[in-house]
């Protein structure tokens, strides 16, 4: 198969239940090379669950998931996963540089030796995300936006082809937002595929060329201009797009002022 036509992530009839309640119901879609995709949906829609079930972090009830037309374990070195910030132990005694260097483990293994070249590359990546001045700081001492950028640096060190990012833009300052967007667009232009669980509809058309609309079931997957409309928004969120965007604008102003 031509790499240009390679399917990076394909989900087939995926179902996930928690205590007999359906969280994801027969989800099927696929994403190819070189896209910047947002997974959108209300709280409880199953967005994070979709990532975790695809990566084997939780067990699906049924269905199959393939990355690059293979099971995850065979191609895990080609995939970078960024968890939600709330799931991280920020008291762990690790510096920002140490966190970035963890990205090497995907291709060196847990016991692989970290070389001076690796350290130089990690520091260069920290410069790229604007964290070189806090490289030796313990990760819990960072602001929310800096913490997100530190995990972005770790993902970049993995040199992956597919990036799955759970709420990358949640509760970050505007400087971190702009830096992160620039990095993601560079990756997309290099032929990488980036998937971000996202909440703010007011940014979607400007940032993402593809969307996955989800509310326990798949509403739409495809180019943003084709999928994002009044009908699909109503199916996903249960309200009109104008009201939803007004609410999100107010919450976004509070969000960017809090970091």
UniProtKB/Swiss-Prot annotation:
Keywords: ATP-binding, Cell inner membrane, Cell membrane, Membrane, Nucleotide-binding, Transport. One of its GO terms (cellular component) is plasma membrane. InterPro entries: AAA+_ATPase (IPR003593), ABC_transporter-like_ATP-bd (IPR003439), ABC_transporter-like_CS (IPR017871), Metal_Ion_Import_ABC (IPR050153), P-loop_NTPase (IPR027417). ATP binds at residues 41-48. It is found in: Cell inner membrane. GO terms for molecular function: ATP binding; ATP hydrolysis activity. SMART domains: AAA (SM00382). Its main location: membrane. It is a peripheral membrane protein. Residues 3-241 form the ABC transporter domain. Pfam families: ABC_tran. Part of an ATP-driven transport system CPn0346/CPn0347/CPn0348/CPn0349 for a metal. Probably responsible for energy coupling to the transport system. Belongs to the ABC transporter superfamily. PANTHER family: IRON TRANSPORT SYSTEM ATP-BINDING PROTEIN HI_0361-RELATED, METAL TRANSPORT SYSTEM ATP-BINDING PROTEIN TM_0124-RELATED. This is Probable metal transport system ATP-binding protein CPn_0348/CP_0412/CPj0348/CpB0355. It comes from Chlamydia pneumoniae (Chlamydophila pneumoniae).
């Amino acid at each position: 198969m031509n790499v240009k036509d390679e399917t990076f992530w394909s989900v087939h009839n995926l179902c996930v239940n928690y205590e007999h309640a359906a969280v994801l119901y027969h989800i099927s879609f696929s994403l190819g090379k070189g896209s910047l995709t947002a997974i959108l949906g209300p709280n409880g829609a199953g967005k994070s669950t979709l990532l975790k079930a695809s990566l084997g972090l939780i067990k699906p009830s049924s269905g199959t998931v393939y990355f690059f037309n293979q099971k995850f374990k065979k191609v895990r070195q080609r995939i970078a996963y960024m968890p939600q910030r709330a799931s991280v132990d920020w008291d762990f005694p690790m510096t920002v540089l140490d966190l970035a260097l963890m990205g090497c483990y995907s291709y060196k293994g847990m016991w692989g030796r970290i070389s001076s070249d690796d350290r130089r590359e990690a520091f260069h990546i920290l410069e790229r995300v604007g964290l070189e001045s806090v490289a030796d700081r313990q990760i819990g001492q960072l602001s929310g936006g800096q913490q997100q950028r530190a995990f972005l640096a770790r993902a970049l060190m993995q040199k992956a082809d597919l990036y799955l990012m759970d709420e990358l833009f949640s509760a970050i300052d505007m400087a971190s937002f702009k830096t992160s967007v620039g990095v993601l667009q560079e990756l997309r232009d290099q032929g990488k595929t980036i998937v971000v669980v996202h909440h703010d509809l007011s940014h979607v058309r400007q940032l993402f060329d593809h969307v996955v609309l989800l509310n326990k079931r798949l509403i739409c997957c495809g180019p943003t201009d084709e999928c994002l409309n009044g009908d699909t928004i109503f199916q996903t969120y249960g309200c009109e797009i104008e009201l939803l965007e007004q609410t999100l604008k107010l919450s976004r102003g509070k969000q960017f002022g809090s970091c």
